[in-house]
């Protein structure tokens, strides 16, 4: 799959459309994905943690799969730092690649505020 095909596939997936995600940039080991929090609030009036985690996971998946190598997540962790109510941007960067598994760090921002830190480990299937 080319990077262009990858971007198209992720942008057109039902999950991306459901949550209103949009890929801003993607290449092997890197992605920037955005999502508006509107309609994704918890009862406290701030972005639902599941929506934030979904955005980070989407950025992770794109960064790990946009070079024609198929990878699947084997573990993820997320640390929420501050609540959010507006447009979020997730920036994913591969920080380690040992040939079988990769580690990717995703930072989620609302403007210049860090909302969450996410770490994902991916297994190389092909």
Predicted region positions:
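N-terminal short leaders/motifs
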Residues: 27-36, 46-47, 65, 109-110
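Non-catalytic linker/capping segments at the edges of enzyme domains
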Residues: 1-32, 38
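Beta-strand residues in well-ordered beta-sheet regions across diverse protein folds
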Residues: 34-36, 91, 105
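HotDog/MaoC-like acyl-thioester-processing domains
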Residues: 83-87, 95-126
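Hydrophobic residues in beta-strands and at strand termini
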Residues: 35-37, 80, 124
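Hydrophobic beta-strand-centered segment that forms part of the acyl-chain substrate-binding groove
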Residues: 61-89, 94-95
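Hot-dog-fold acyl-thioester-processing enzymes
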Residues: 34-59
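A generic structural signal for short beta-strands and their flanking turns/coil linkers
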Residues: 17-19, 29-31, 70-76, 86-88, ...
């Amino acid at each position: 799959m080319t990077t262009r095909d990858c971007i198209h596939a992720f942008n057109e997936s039902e999950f991306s459309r459901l949550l209103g995600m949009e890929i801003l940039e993607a290449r092997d080991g890197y992605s920037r994905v955005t999502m508006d929090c509107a309609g994704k609030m918890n009862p406290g009036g701030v972005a639902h943690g599941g929506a934030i985690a979904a955005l980070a996971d989407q950025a992770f998946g794109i960064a790990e799969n946009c070079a024609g190598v198929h990878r699947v997540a084997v573990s993820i962790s997320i640390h929420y730092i501050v609540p959010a109510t507006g447009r979020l941007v997730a920036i994913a960067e591969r920080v380690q690649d040992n040939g079988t598994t990769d580690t990717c760090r995703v930072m989620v921002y609302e403007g210049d505020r860090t909302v969450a830190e996410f770490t994902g480990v991916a297994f190389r299937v092909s």
